[in-house]
Structure formats: C-alpha cells, structure tokens
C-alpha cells in the first residue's frame, strides 16, 4: 500500500476530489497554506493499493494538464508500513 500526498490549489481541489472519488478512491482533504505568496492550497491524502497508484496519478494528470506548462499540483508517493481502520 502507498500513501499519495497531493498538494493542489484551492480552485483545483474540488475537481480532483470528485474525479478520484468517482473512481472509488477514498480521499481525505486537509486545508493548508504554502508557497511564496501564502496562497490557499489543499492537501489531499489517499491510501492506495500498489497496483492503483499509476491510475490515481493518471486521473489527476488528466484533469490538470495545462498547455502553458504551469505546474498545478505536487504529488508524493510514500510506502505505508501499516494500515488500520478502527
């Protein structure tokens, strides 16, 4: 299992969340602040099976592709040693 940590601009977060939940990914949304101008960003956390990581990233890329070359999200994929629901 992997944890995808996705940091996106506020105005993109709803679209990304809807896209991922429609594909049956479970998403936790955390408000955060970052960047030089302290602009509003959202951090999304996804617990994803190893074989679905590329699919999840592909969905995000398909919604955020930009012809201007602007980077609209930052993603980290980290291993999860243990996962429990209580």
What feature does the model see in each segment?
Residues 1-86:
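Positively charged, small/polar-rich N-terminal and surface patches that mediate targeting and assembly
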């Amino acid at each position: 299992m992997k944890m995808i940590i996705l940091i996106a601009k506020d105005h993109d977060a709803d679209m990304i969340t809807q896209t991922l939940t429609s594909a049956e990914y479970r998403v936790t949304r955390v408000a955060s602040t970052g960047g030089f101008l302290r602009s509003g960003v959202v951090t999304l956390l996804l617990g994803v099976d190893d074989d679905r990581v590329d699919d999840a990233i592909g969905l995000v890329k398909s919604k955020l592709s930009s012809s201007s070359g602007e980077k609209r999200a930052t993603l980290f994929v980290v291993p999860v040693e243990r996962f429990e629901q209580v």
